[in-house]
Amino acid sequence: MPDALVAWLRDVEELRSLPQRYARAIDARDIDGLALLFHPDGVVDGMRGSSPVPAYIDGLRDAKRVFESSMHVLGDPLISHEPGSATAHLDTYAVVHQLDKVDGSGGDATLGVRYLDDVVQRGGRWVIRHRQARILWHRASAG
C-alpha cells in the first residue's frame, strides 16, 4: 500500500475518533480532557451562542450540573478530508441522553444533535477549530 494512502487512512481513523473522544470527555465531565480536543483559537457555536474556545471551556467548568449523567450516542461521522491536507470537516449526528435532574424531580431529556466540525492538525493531532452544535429535536420527561 503506498505511503500516502496509509497516511490518509491513519488521518481518517483519527478524525473518526475525535467525536467519540469528545463524547466520552463531556459525559465524564472531564473538562481538561475536553479542552485538549479544541484549538485554543477556535470557536464553538452552540446552545449558549457563539464563544471562543477558552470561554466555552471555562463556561463548562463553571456550569452547575443540571443532570446527574449524560450519554452521547454517536452515528459514524461523515468525513471530508483530502489526502495530505491539514484540514478536514466532520458531520456527526448524536442522540444525547441526559438522566436524573439534580433538582430532585427525576426528569430526563433526550436530544437529537448535529455536530459540524472544522478540524485542523495542531502539534501532530487533530483538533476542532470551529464547531457548530445544532439541536434538531428535544424531548423531556417528568420524573
Language model feature labels by segment:
Residues 31-97:
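A solvent-exposed, acidic/Ser-Thr-rich amphipathic alpha-helical stretch
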